[in-house]
Amino acid sequence: MTDQATRFRLDIAYQGTDFAGWARQPDLRTVQGTLEEALATIFRCSGEPPSLTVAGRTDAGVHATGQVAHVDLSPEQVALLRRPHGKREPQLAHDALKRRVNGVLGPVPDVLVSRATEAPAGFDARFSALWRRYEYRVADRIALRDPLQRHRTAWVPNTLDVDAMDRGAHGMLGLHDFASYCKAREGATTIRTLQAFSWRRDAEGVLLGEVAADAFCHSMVRALVGACVEVGEGKLRPGDLVTLRDERQRTSAFKVMPARGLTLREVGYPVDAELGRRAEQTRGLRTL
């Protein structure tokens, strides 16, 4: 970020069904690519559009109601946003940014900016975050299987023991190496602090898994859910989740669940005065 640039926070929601994930990829429709194309249209960019930095790089098919990103805009771009449009009075830049991005995305988009604000000093959508909270939906034999929810719910044929799943999930909390539940990436740590993990049934009998951590490694949430489903089916005991975790290597004892059941619900940040300090702390490598 240059000294003259202004940073904006964008709160974003999307249905991930038709996206190849968040991250921009050549010749594939992604959330980042779609939003950056909208920015390029607004600012008439002939080269690289303003780049988005995101709190959580969701995989293909994963949804979000509470994704957070930031974008740095030049003084000229901010002035363009503030410029009166038609009969409108001069606009607040953040209001105009939200309105114009959503205008480019169309009347019935599968991604939109739900809020735009000028970011406080020190804010970084990725590194300032304290936690990310996800929800996973599973319909089993006794749950209502609603065709209208098929794009955001995983289905399993058996009846699941939600109490056993909840006990297994609770035992996973804390700072640990989750290599057994992560897809390996060279140079990336698999040490995470799991802050919340629980299971319950909603009014329609659908199982809702809620999981929060300081950060998640690749496929970690869906692997954790897959292990819990094995517990719910009686194929694993609740305590086996900890045993598998402590082995620190991928196993065939459970399957990674489908992306469609997963939604990023919320990203949490500290008070404004702590944003910069949190970002510096997070950039350091996690250790046990």
From Swiss-Prot:
Active site: 59
Keywords: Isomerase, tRNA processing
UniProt binding sites for substrate: 134
Isomerase listed as a keyword: yes
Record InterPro entries: PsdUridine_synth_cat_dom_sf (IPR020103), PsdUridine_synth_TruA (IPR001406), PsdUridine_synth_TruA_a/b_dom (IPR020097), PsdUridine_synth_TruA_C (IPR020095), TruA/RsuA/RluB/E/F_N (IPR020094)
Enzyme Commission number(s) of this protein: 5.4.99.12
Annotated catalysed reactions: uridine(38/39/40) in tRNA = pseudouridine(38/39/40) in tRNA
Top-level EC class: isomerase
One of the Pfam families matching this protein, by short name: PseudoU_synth_1
A GO biological-process term: tRNA pseudouridine synthesis
GO molecular function (one): tRNA pseudouridine(38-40) synthase activity
Family recorded in the similarity comment: Belongs to the tRNA pseudouridine synthase TruA family.
Quaternary structure and interacting proteins, as annotated: Homodimer.
Role played: Formation of pseudouridine at positions 38, 39 and 40 in the anticodon stem and loop of transfer RNAs.
The protein's name: tRNA pseudouridine synthase A
Species name: Leifsonia xyli subsp. xyli (strain CTCB07)
Taxon lineage: Bacteria, Bacillati, Actinomycetota, Actinomycetes, Micrococcales
